[in-house]
A protein has these predicted regions:
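Catalytic domains of carbohydrate-active enzymes, especially glycoside hydrolases
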Residues: 234-254
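A low-complexity, Ser/Thr/Gly/Pro-enriched, surface-exposed linker/loop concept
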Residues: 27-64, 92-97
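Short, well-ordered beta-strand segments enriched in hydrophobic/aromatic residues
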Residues: 26, 36-38, 63, 74-76, ...
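Catalytic core of carbohydrate-active enzymes
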Residues: 408-420, 427-439, 460-470, 475-724, ...
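Extended Gly/Ser/Thr-rich low-complexity repeat segments
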Residues: 45-55, 80-96, 734-751
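Catalytic and substrate-binding clefts that recognize carbohydrates or anionic sugar/phosphate headgroups
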Residues: 57-213, 223-224, 229, 236-241, ...
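Aromatic- and carboxylate-enriched substrate-binding clefts and catalytic-loop regions
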Residues: 87, 98, 247-537, 572-574
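Bacterial Sec-dependent N-terminal signal peptides
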Residues: 1-21
Length: 769
């Protein structure tokens, strides 16, 4: 079949081809990114919500080449002519009735190799790393959130730019994307050569990742819910008294009062009598306050009345359905009247922020935007409702992006003194640009659900969105309660073991956050100091704070260099086919290999039930870990050097998550602190792991404003070549920057360990070990 190679044509903004039944439009956005549009008629796609990049015209030397057959089928090759992907059949069928009349249902097939893994798609609770064979209708929900993007082990990615419910189907050779409403077929092919390159491309296309506040990388304590201001304050004081680090405290719902006042965005509950002073007291203890806000409103609230007057409320069933709180199942004879707002409307987003500003003026630090999916009990005809951007069907999946970006944009316009931080439950492509971290919804407190969180977080990261976490311990632990009682899960050894292992996984998430219903999660609920479970929890939290300089420096690489916190093994070791489908190991940053313990090793069962069994938490326990080929590995706790490409038996006592360091790594460790900003980073231990060359850029700034965007930060480059370490000249400065730093250098090569102390004033230093 004759094809035309578009990449050798003249440099144009776009190239149009006319096939038998469809027109094809090819637009280069960069040498690596090309947009394909197909239409049965004229091209009239409105502006993309996700894509913010402008096309650059057909490059003289594209890294991806496009050819179009007479029937409109597109093939992609790399610069050397190696085939990357070929389309299969496409379909653009007119919708002839209903509110979407005049639009089309659109679909496109892609021919993949049968043994070609793909990754991404958002948050799937399926426990799989390789997502071949998926067949599902993708629509945002509580525990599963989708973005129409996948990337291949071949180093390319596909972003299907459509916001309606979309079905992915895969018969083993054909992956098909089919959307219920669209202007046209519209997708982007991104060739990065590897996973990092694809992520760089999707962020260039849809938005870069801003820096989050330093404190957000500390430990967060939450519960469903703190019922009084005093109860929350007692938790913050309890951590300070126990000398266990804490940075974030989170206030869940109903600080506004009853369900008719749902999400009033003000403190109307008499159990929170002095919110301004309360927030100030939290700050005086070195902690930060996040607060729950929703995308729905009760009928007795100010925002409800304003939005209703403007016709900016939807009429579908959302949560809570009952006006009476704390009754399950809900009393539908007392309907709450709670409804979601039309976040697709710029005017509605203005109203939302103008009401949220009451909380902003209290000096709240961060927003917990719950139910951005949103919660929706579907009825026939709901998707026929009209939003400010068209039918709800046509834009359903970008609802979370509209909600979250609305708050981000308004806060950025309000002030540059406080970085935006949003914890949210749902996601769509582009949301990585909004200062948001997405959690995986209301998971069950089971080992099975815990195991699912690891590949979920990794596949989410492979969509280009690096900020992700889950409810440590799972949201629903009630099966562990003593029969007839509540708040007893934390005394149940079955839940204790699960909680500790989930916490150890959370230690290596971008956000370390404990949350759930039916049981208090504060450290003292699990025992007391000197007891194995308590000590294991404290050890994990303290290690998080030791790693803060490493984590924050990684955050800078995420912002400045398209990096990722949680790295699926295919990102660094794609040449090792054994890692292509490993769902329970990952890199945290570029240096740390994490292998969470995902099975019960100390208790007798993984069932969710009450147990009073006596557990020997000190007995030896072991698990198997695969060390990827392509590197040697140091065991974190012992320093033992191991070869890659083998499975090893790792010690896994209750207070230890198997952890390895890639040979050729530099890891800065911070001081012992009670909160992230308690002490400056002027006295650090720096661990240097030899056996390969190493590069690391240490980053520091003012911690919680946007001055870094204007160059107010500093970086220090560490380079290891053989046994010689060079600490480069300090680049940049910021207000409050230490003029001098002490570095305690600890070098190991598996045979010997050498320690050096360096007084660093900002000029380059060379050290030989």
């Amino acid at each position: 079949m004759k094809k035309i190679l578009l990449s050798v044509m003249a440099i144009l903004a776009a190239v149009y081809m006319y096939a038998a039944d469809v027109q094809v439009k090819v637009t280069y956005y960069s040498p690596e990114i090309v947009r394909i549009e197909k239409s049965a008629g004229a091209f009239h796609r409105t502006n993309s919500v996700s894509v913010i990049m402008e096309p650059q015209g057909t490059p003289a030397k594209p890294k991806v080449k496009v050819s179009v057959a007479k029937d409109g089928t597109v093939t992609f090759t790399d610069a050397k002519g190696r085939k990357l992907l070929t389309e299969g059949a496409s379909s653009v069928e007119a919708i002839t009735e209903g509110v979407d009349k005049g639009f089309w249902t659109v679909s496109q097939e892609f021919k993949l190799d049968s043994d070609e893994p793909i990754y991404g798609l958002g948050m799937l609770q399926n426990g799989k790393m390789n997502l071949r064979g998926e067949n599902r209708r993708m629509i945002q929900s509580n525990t599963e959130d989708y973005t129409n993007f996948f990337q291949s082990i071949k180093g390319y990615g596909i972003f299907w730019d459509n916001y309606s419910p979309t079905t992915i189907s895969d018969d083993g050779t054909i992956v098909k994307l089919a959307s219920e409403v669209g202007d046209e077929i519209d997708y982007y092919f991104i060739y990065g050569g590897n996973a990092d390159g694809v992520i760089a491309g999707i962020r260039q296309l849809t938005g870069e990742v801003p820096m989050l506040p330093l404190w957000t990388y500390g430990y967060h304590q939450s519960r469903e819910r703190y019922k009084t201001g005093k109860e929350l304050m007692d938790v913050v004081k309890g951590y300070r008294d126990a000398k266990v680090p804490l940075d974030g405290i989170i206030q869940d719902w109903q600080y506004w009062g009853n369900n008719y006042l749902w999400n009033a965005m003000e403190f109307l509950n008499e159990d929170f009598p002095n919110p301004k002073g309360w927030v100030e007291e939290v700050h005086n203890l070195g902690a930060h306050m996040s607060i729950s806000i929703w995308q729905s409103f009760g009928p007795q609230t100010k925002p409800y009345r304003e939005l209703k007057e403007k016709g900016l409320l939807f009429d579908f069933i959302t949560w809570p359905q009952s006006g009476i709180s704390h009754i399950w199942p809900p009393r539908r004879d007392y309907p709450s009247g709670v409804v979601c707002y039309d976040a697709y409307s710029a005017e509605a987003r203005d109203i939302y922020w103008n009401n949220l500003k009451r909380l902003w003026d209290l000096d709240i630090d961060a927003w917990w935007m719950d139910s951005t999916d949103p919660d929706h009990t579907y009825r026939e005809g709901d998707f026929d409702q009209m939003s400010a951007m068209g039918s709800l069907r046509s834009v359903r999946n970008i609802y979370p992006l509209m909600c979250v970006e609305g708050v981000y944009d308004h806060q950025r316009a309000e002030s540059s003194d406080k970085r935006v931080f949003i914890l949210t439950r749902s996601f769509f492509m582009g949301q990585q640009r909004t200062g948001a971290n997405t959690w995986s919804g209301d998971t069950q407190s089971t080992w099975e659900d815990f195991r699912k969180q690891i590949p979920l977080c990794l596949n989410y990261t492979l969509t280009g969105a690096p900020q992700v976490n889950s409810d440590i311990g799972g949201f629903f632990p009630s099966g562990y309660n003593k029969p007839g009682q509540t708040q007893t899960c934390s005394t149940n050894p079955l839940f204790q073991e699960l909680y500790v292992r989930w916490l150890q996984f959370g230690l290596f998430n971008p956000m370390m956050r404990s949350h759930g219903e039916s049981s208090r999660r504060e450290i003292w609920e699990f025992g007391k100091k000197g007891e194995p479970v308590y000590d294991a929890i404290e050890k994990a939290i303290r290690m998080r704070y030791k790693l803060l300089p490493y984590i924050y420096s990684t955050a800078w690489q995420v912002t400045s260099n398209h990096d990722s916190f949680m790295r699926a093994l295919i990102m660094d070791f794609a040449a090792d086919k054994k890692v292509w489908d490993i769902p329970d190991e990952f890199m945290f940053g570029r240096s740390l290999l994490v292998a969470p313990v995902t099975n019960a090793l100390f208790t007798s069962t993984e069932e969710r039930k009450w147990s009073e069994e006596t557990v020997n938490w000190t007995k030896p326990a072991y698990t198997e870990v695969y060390l990827p080929a392509g590197a040697d590995w140091y065991e974190w706790h012992s320093g033992k050097l191991l070869k890659g490409g083998q499975t090893v038996t790792a010690a896994a006592p209750i207070d230890r998550c198997p952890l390895y360091v890639k040979a050729g790594s530099i890891i800065p460790l911070g001081p012992d602190v009670q909160y992230a900003k308690e002490k400056p980073w002027n006295d650090l231990e720096v661990r240097i792991y030899g056996g390969a060359n190493a590069d690391f850029t240490f980053y520091d700034d003012e911690g919680d404003n946007y001055n870094y965007e204007n160059g107010r930060y500093c970086t220090i480059d560490f380079k290891l070549r053989g046994r010689t370490l060079t600490i480069g000249r300090r680049n940049g400065s910021y207000s409050g920057m230490p003029a001098f730093r002490k570095f305690r250098l600890v070098y190991t090569d598996g045979k010997r360990t050498v320690t050096r102390n360096v007084e660093y004033s900002g000029t380059a230093v060379t050290i030989n070990f």
